[in-house]
Regions:
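Outer-membrane beta-barrel pore domains
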Residues: 51, 120-121, 147, 168-171, ...
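N-terminal periplasmic/intermembrane-space "pro-region" immediately following the signal or transit peptide
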Residues: 21-110, 447
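Short secondary-structure boundary/capping elements
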Residues: 31, 126-128, 135, 218, ...
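Outer membrane beta-barrel
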Residues: 92-244, 250-276, 354-375
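Bacterial N-terminal signal peptides that target proteins for export
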Residues: 1-9
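Hydrophobic membrane-targeting alpha-helices
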Residues: 16-21, 430
Length: 447
């Protein structure tokens, strides 16, 4: 019985084993089919990503091609423009100019209306070309330049005429040969006398007012000038002929002038100047190259006087404000000659105070007070008065001027100005100087 049971169990297992294997195979087939389906879906997703990436790549390639084409066209245009500029420069270069090719032309001027009291310059009211100057600045070779100035009209001229202003060769930064940068440069020719500061801003476009100070010390003369800068210090010194003739010097003695400047910071400037005109021939030179009081230094001696001279010293200060400036200067002068009969030596003093302030962005106001104290012997001081009357007539003992002005700056190259100046003084004979007040309106320009 037991043997039969065992035999039956064995027979059952032998029959069921293949069936179990077949069931396992069916399960494996079903799992494989599911994996294949998932792989197909992933493949489709990857293909879609590749298609999108290919589209992006094609768009980027198109943009790169456009940029490259634009860059090529831009380069072509730049090359063409550079070629045109070279051709234009070659055409514009003056014939026979063998320098570096750097040449600049410019002009400055002022036109307006001037009227004064009966004893002034303009008793009838004059429309006038107040200033007109032409400039030429050219590079000769490296660090050597030429500068020339032609005056067609000036405040001091009685008519429109051609006169030579500055003209010099500038040997720049000679100190570089010794390893010192900008310590020494040299000008040779016809230059402004380096005395004081006002002359550097007396042109119509640079002067915030229309009038100048009463002393108005300035001059152009032939000679040699040395200038440079060391740290916060600057200097200029010149040896010049000293007399008014432009083509001759009638005395071996020369004019010597110099200025030492100091800039401790960006808003403060200080300077000290000194000058001697040197001995001037009373008949040959006749007048100094240096202007003073809208006139000159001239001989004040008698018939036996053959030589005369003047010595001067001045201190200047400028305070640069965010919306304006303050300027002041004061000085001393001494005149002497070799008159064998009389002692004509005399000392005098002068000063000026100036303030300029922006009212609005382009509108500004300015005021200047100046005075000359010439002492009991007096000096020939013209001021706003008639030249013939006050330069060759009775000498002036003291005189003052108050100038009030407004200006509108359309740009740094175009300024409209108006000013009223009060001026009074006394002559050595006790008479008063009056009726010299002046009104002026002017348009100053530069290009």
């Amino acid at each position: 019985m037991t043997r039969g049971i065992h035999l039956g169990v064995a027979l059952f297992l032998w029959v069921m084993a293949p069936l179990a294997g077949w069931a396992s195979v069916d399960d494996d087939v079903a799992g494989t089919q599911e994996q294949l389906r998932l792989l197909q879906e992933q493949n489709r997703a990857l293909q879609e990503q590749l298609r999108q990436q290919q589209t992006v790549i094609e768009l980027l390639s198109k943009k790169v091609d456009e940029i490259q084409r634009a860059g090529t066209e831009q380069n072509r245009q730049l090359v063409s423009l550079e070629s045109e500029m070279k051709e234009a420069d070659a055409v514009a270069k003056p014939s026979g100019f063998n320098g570096s090719g750097k040449l600049s032309l410019g002009a400055e001027g002022g036109v307006g209306f001037f009227t004064s009291g009966s004893a002034g310059h303009y008793p009838n009211g004059d429309f006038r070309v107040d200033e007109m100057r032409l400039f030429l600045d050219a590079s000769v070779v490296e660090n050597v330049s030429f500068y020339g100035e032609l005056n067609l009209a000036t405040r001091e001229s009685t008519d429109v005429e051609f006169r030579l202003g500055e003209l010099y060769i500038d040997f720049e930064n000679l100190s570089r040969f010794w390893g010192w940068d900008k310590v020494l440069s040299v000008r040779l020719g016809r230059m402004y006398v380096p005395f004081g500061e006002e002359y550097q801003n007396r042109y119509a476009i640079d002067n915030p007012l229309i009038s100048h100070s009463l002393s108005d010390l300035w001059g152009v003369d032939e000679g040699i000038e040395l200038y440079g800068r060391v740290g916060k210090f600057s200097y200029a010194a010149a040896v010049q002929n000293g007399g008014i003739p432009d083509t001759a010097d009638y005395d071996k003695d020369k004019s010597v002038a110099g200025r030492l400047g100091y800039d401790p910071n960006h808003w403060l400037h200080l300077s000290a100047s000194a000058m001697r005109t040197g001995n001037l021939d009373a008949t040959g030179d006749f007048l100094s190259a240096m202007w003073f009081g809208n006139g000159f230094f001239r001989s004040l001696g008698g018939p036996g006087t053959t030589k005369f001279h003047a010595d001067l010293a001045e201190g200047d200060i400028e305070v640069r404000l965010p919306r304006g400036s303050l300027k002041a200067f004061g000085g001393w002068f001494q005149y002497d000659d070799n008159d064998p009969v009389n002692n004509n030596r005399r000392d005098g003093y002068y000063y000026s105070l100036e303030a300029v302030h922006d009212i609005f962005e382009k509108l500004y106001g300015g005021v200047r007070f100046s005075q000359i104290l010439a002492g009991s012997k007096g000096m020939p001081i013209v001021g706003n008065g008639d030249f013939g009357q006050f330069f060759f007539g009775p000498l002036t003992k003291d005189i003052w001027r108050l100038s009030l002005g407004l200006g509108y700056k359309f740009s740094r190259n175009l300024v409209l100005k108006a000013e009223y100046s009060f001026e009074q003084g006394r002559l050595v004979n006790g008479e008063q100087r009056d009726d010299e007040n002046q009104f002026a309106a002017e348009v100053a320009f530069r290009f």
